[in-house]
Swiss-Prot record:
Protein name: Isocitrate dehydrogenase kinase/phosphatase
PANTHER family given in the database record: ISOCITRATE DEHYDROGENASE KINASE_PHOSPHATASE, PTHR39559
The organism's taxonomic lineage, starting at the top: Bacteria, Pseudomonadati, Pseudomonadota, Gammaproteobacteria, Enterobacterales
GO MF entry, a single one: phosphoprotein phosphatase activity
Impact upon substituting R174H: In strain: S3041 and S3044
Outcome following mutation: P151L: In strain: S2980 and S2983
Species in which this protein is naturally found: Salmonella typhimurium (strain LT2 / SGSC1412 / ATCC 700720)
Outcome recorded upon mutating L184F: In strain: S3041 and S3044
Resulting phenotype, T181A: In strain: S3015 and S3027
Length: 583
């Protein structure tokens, strides 16, 4: 290769990333208009298209590089010089951290995920940690209650860029003050102030005002979800001021926010104070930088591995028929491999399973489906693998594994947040905790269905419980759209003997689902059955599911709340209006 080509290649990669992130910001900047126009289907489409942008631009850069190098192979020294030139371009670059991930992605695409070494890739960042600890330009604005909280909140709401009228701004301000007074106390409130992010965070049918509430005792989140009525009037639905509530809003089971972030590292650093339980990977994920979140997730994994002497073991729970799942005992994530052969009742291909995981990545997860990161050629040290797991890997997924002596390479896997399997949770809890878990499970099913997702296999083992007690679906191999399912009532038996027969007396076609049958496996436990019948009996009726299908086919997009219904101002302080409640 001619000298000087290394710099051209480095510049080409960085220019390719510039183009990708420019389009990312362009799609993101349309969020306000989509919200104001209530174009909810465009919201869903923008979410999908923004996810696709990254891989699309990686592909464009790879084609450019193949043209530049005329398809000739490159030696190791040449690649190291390319990385050195690229590193020199980053110190003054505002999105250096994601640019490093983009470089990694281009390299992996060019070399088919081979030779992934720290020398060739940005396994760890080349730049100082948290370079934007001091933010170069303000991301937020401070508001002080010099003349009381009512004018302070009036200024905050009036400063918003939204161009719709308010339904009743004074009422919403009263509700916010009432909440703050209940939470902080009347004496403390005058000594507090608020810092509000300059950009709104858009997701689903809400525009979130995200801020920090500084109190005499510390800093709290200050989150206001702003909705619009069918008539196009704005209202604040609630006020959230605890780290637990904020953690759920920014949770791993939710869709990515649309927030205009030309300096993503600075925004992540700013968010860190009100989301102390979130890792760097989770914060990048929340603002839509999911590919860099994957990089950060891998770094977190490597750091944990370096400080731990634990061995990889099979994950607790009932062994799956499609996926082999393992973990490190103290690590908060699991590793999932598609088996080479599935159980006989699972009539599907590995390609189908991967398509299901991609569907979840692109769809609105409504807080009920765990996000995943996909990896290829994942290397594990054999010394850190429990012998029982090693035997299981060789038995269930030998075609996915390459033995390199001291290491194995797993051709393809997913990393996902670790949760307590719901079936195990239900065995361990009693009383109110059991009731809450069953309520959560039913709510998860309803919210998934309203978002046009049918889980397929609804057994408790396919759901997990988060540290906040939320029930989340994580087994995607039978997932499909609600509109693809034929929900049927079981026909009456022709003769008494029909109900005792081993085969059904009625025809069953592909796509047929009989909700009455759910009762057999969801209500078998005498502790659970009565609770389920009390709270979720309608899930056993085909007409309930068909009614949801009708709403979906008519184009209705359901509201998705990242908090309990009882926290809504309309419930706490009186009805906003029938119109607002139906928005």
């Amino acid at each position: 290769m001619p000298r000087g080509l290394e710099l051209l290649i480095a510049q080409t990669i960085l220019q390719g990333f510039d183009a990708q992130y420019g389009r990312f910001l362009e799609v993101t900047s349309g969020a306000q208009q989509r919200f104001e126009q209530a174009d909810w289907h465009a919201v869903q489409q923008a979410m999908k298209s923004r996810i696709h942008l990254y891989d699309h631009h990686v592909g464009l850069v790879v084609e450019q590089l193949r043209c530049i190098t005329d398809g000739k192979s490159t030696d190791a020294d040449f690649l190291l010089r390319v990385k050195e030139h690229y590193t020199r371009l980053l110190p003054d670059y505002p999105r250096f951290e994601i640019a490093e991930s983009f470089f990694n992605s281009v390299y992996c695409r060019l070399f088919d995920h081979r030779s992934l070494t720290p020398e060739r890739l940005f396994i760890f960042s080349s730049q100082p940690e948290r370079r934007f600890r001091t933010i170069p330009r303000p991301l937020a604005k401070d508001f002080f209650p010099d003349h009381g909280w009512e004018p302070l909140l009036m200024r905050i709401l009036s400063d918003l860029p939204l161009r719709l009228p308010w339904q009743n701004k004074s009422r919403d301000i009263r509700y916010i003050i009432a909440h703050l007074t209940e939470t902080l106390g009347e004496d403390a409130l005058p000594r507090c102030h608020v810092q509000v992010a300059n950009e709104l965070f858009y997701r689903n049918k809400a525009a979130w005002l995200v801020g920090k509430l500084t109190t005499p005792d510390g800093t709290l989140p200050f989150l206001l979800p702003i909705h619009r009525t069918d008539e196009g009037e704005l209202f604040v639905d609630t006020c959230l001021t605890t780290t637990a509530e904020a953690s759920i809003v920014f949770g791993f089971a939710r869709s990515y926010f649309m927030v205009y972030a030309p300096l993503p590292a600075a925004l992540v650093e700013w968010l860190r104070e009100i989301l102390p339980g979130k890792t760097t990977a989770e914060l990048y994920m929340a603002i839509g930088c999911q590919k860099h979140a994957k990089t950060e997730s891998y770094r977190e994994y490597l750091c944990y591995l370096a400080e731990s002497d634990e061995k990889f073991i099979e994950a607790p729970g009932i062994r799956g028929m499609v996926m082999l799942v393992f973990t490190l005992p103290g690590f908060d994530r699991v590793f999932k491999i598609i088996k080479d052969k599935f159980a006989p009742q699972k009539e599907m291909s590995a390609a189908h399973v991967r398509a299901c995981y991609q569907l979840v990545k692109e769809h609105d997860r409504v807080g009920r489906m765990a996000d995943t990161q996909e990896f290829e050629n994942f290397v594990l040290d054999k010394r850190q693998i429990d012998p029982a797991l090693m035997a299981l890997l060789r038995q269930e997924a030998p075609e996915k594994i390459t033995d390199l002596g001291e290491h194995i390479v797993i051709r393809h896997l997913y990393i996902e947040r670790r949760m307590v399997p719901l079936n195990i949770w239900l065995e361990q809890v009693e009383g109110q905790q059991l009731r809450d878990a069953i309520e959560e499970y039913g709510n998860a099913i309803r919210q998934l269905a309203a978002a046009n997702i049918f889980p397929g296999d609804m057994l408790f083992k396919n759901f997990g419980v988060t540290r906040h007690g939320r029930v989340v679906f994580y087994d995607y191999d039978e997932i499909c759209y609600m509109t693809e399912v034929n929900f049927r009532d079981i026909p009456p038996a022709r003769y008494p003997e029909d109900e005792l027969a081993s085969e059904p007396w009625y025809s069953v076609s592909p796509g047929d689902v009989f909700p009455e049958e759910f009762r057999h496996w969801l209500c078998a436990d005498p502790r659970i059955g009565p609770l389920f019948e009390e709270m979720h009996a309608d899930l056993f009726r085909a007409d309930y599911w068909r009614a949801l299908q009708t709403r979906i086919k008519e184009g209705h997009v359901e509201d998705v709340y990242a908090y309990r219904r009882r926290q809504r101002f309309s419930v706490r302080y009186g009805a906003i209006s029938s119109t607002a409640n139906s928005s």
